Amino acid sequence: MIKDMIDSIEQFAQTQADFPVYDCLGERRTYGQLKRDSDSIAAFIDSLALLAKSPVLVFGAQTYDMLATFVALTKSGHAYIPVDVHSAPERILAIIEIAKPSLIIAIEEFPLTIEGISLVSLSEIESAKLAEMPYERTHSVKGDDNYYIIFTSGTTGQPKGVQISHDNLLSFTNWMIEDAAFDVPKQPQMLAQPPYSFDLSVMYWAPTLALGGTLFALPKELVADFKQLFTTIAQLPVGIWTSTPSFADMAMLSDDFCQARMPALTHFYFDGEELTVSTARKLFERFPSAKIINAYGPTEATVALSAIEITREMVDNYTRLPIGYPKPDSPTYIIDEDGKELASGEQGEIIVTGPAVSKGYLNNPEKTAEAFFTFKGQPAYHTGDIGSLTEDNILLYGGRLDFQIKYAGYRIELEDVSQQLNQSPMVASAVAVPRYNKEHKVQNLLAYIVVKDGVKERFDRELELTKAIKASVKDHMMSYMMPSKFLYRDSLPLTPNGKIDIKTLINEVNNR
């Protein structure tokens, strides 16, 4: 168990100063360097005389200087707001307007001119590092102080800043490094793929820094080159893979992504979206000896609230994989529309309680009051997810409350339709989306389909292919759930966080 994230890093700077904490295609930085650099940057930040505990926006990619700046800000008592280099200018502006940061640190060239807020460039960070200033930690982030603030996409399009405290982070990190499901080894060798602006990144950097491991990052230029990306990943000595399931699906398009080519890769950690039976089955075929851990949880409950190791028996017997045993310190409940706790096996909304629950959305009391509350004397959060608990306290996922539609008199869960279509042996990936009429009632249901290699060539017309796919799933799919139109694509759009971008597809079919 760790009691302070920075204390842990400082300890490794003493005991394994020359061990790499960061590796980008062979460009390495050690724990000793991280301490020296973060001390110097923290001293520089203190010299700016910012308002105590005010948040600082940090703009960039998955570079070492981003990591060193995060550590420096924690030392100097400031929460950091990570904003990815690929973020749209409109989103960056919205984050600034909501967060009102006292400073912007631009590790990459900043795309906006902001009046009234000082901007520190990479050259100034480099100069601060060269100064090698000593630093005494007298006002570091601790307890209920905000450690980081991650902005999620709000349903209205307005981002919401989730405040995660040092205590929240410790609750998550200690569970992850001690829980048998994750089985995190000492000095873990972690692939650092999800951007820092996505809280799934915490699942790789927190246990790595807590256990003295190495983060294997990828330059932003490489991430944009699909073929080269997965050729390079196959050459990295990573032992643990952390990503969304969608990113693993992309990786499996490369023949190099297999146990024979990547023998060091023994653990897969998934979170951020649903892990399908199809993806898990394919992974077991590619990596027969690997452990697949399925985690679940919203950003508002600090990355994940449950986890479970997926077995081959689960893949054979479940249509939707279980999402885990809840964290011991985070009692998780299923409630009905009236807020009443439901019994085992009954489906309702998943709510999470305990020390990992955020204090709320930054500068947004209205949205905070809607989502955060007290349940059984503990801080609690409405996940907006449908689920149930088995008698063995295993959490089962039933979809999103806001992805439920009413169609032809039936209440339909879009993710359930997608799951059923993904069961077809011809389908590589499928997403169901509604088309609305002028009264915003569902007019019909459509499906975006990516078929497996070689499938299209077996059919003369798409109509015949559609009939074949429908026939392959009709025995386990209710007729009213079957989409009326299938749209075939070579790939489906992904969000910057690597999830299938369902909202973009919904907007596309509705000409928004």
UniProtKB/Swiss-Prot annotation:
What is this protein's name? D-alanine--D-alanyl carrier protein ligase
Recorded GO CC terms: cytoplasm
Query: Could you tell me what this protein does?
Result: Catalyzes the first step in the D-alanylation of lipoteichoic acid (LTA), the activation of D-alanine and its transfer onto the D-alanyl carrier protein (Dcp) DltC. In an ATP-dependent two-step reaction, forms a high energy D-alanyl-AMP intermediate, followed by transfer of the D-alanyl residue as a thiol ester to the phosphopantheinyl prosthetic group of the Dcp. D-alanylation of LTA plays an important role in modulating the properties of the cell wall in Gram-positive bacteria, influencing the net charge of the cell wall.
**What Gene3D superfamilies does the entry give?**
3.30.300.30, N-terminal domain of ligase-like
**What is catalysed by this protein?**
holo-[D-alanyl-carrier protein] + D-alanine + ATP = D-alanyl-[D-alanyl-carrier protein] + AMP + diphosphate
Question: Which Enzyme Commission number(s) are on file for it?
Answer: 6.2.1.54
Pfam families for this protein: AMP-binding, AMP-binding_C
Can you tell me which family this protein belongs to?
Answer: Belongs to the ATP-dependent AMP-binding enzyme family. DltA subfamily.
Recorded hits in PANTHER family, A to Z, give:
ENZYME, PUTATIVE (JCVI)-RELATED, PTHR45398
GO BP: any one term: lipoteichoic acid biosynthetic process
Write out the residues that bind D-alanine. Answer: 199, 303, 499
Keyword tRNA processing in the entry? The reply is no
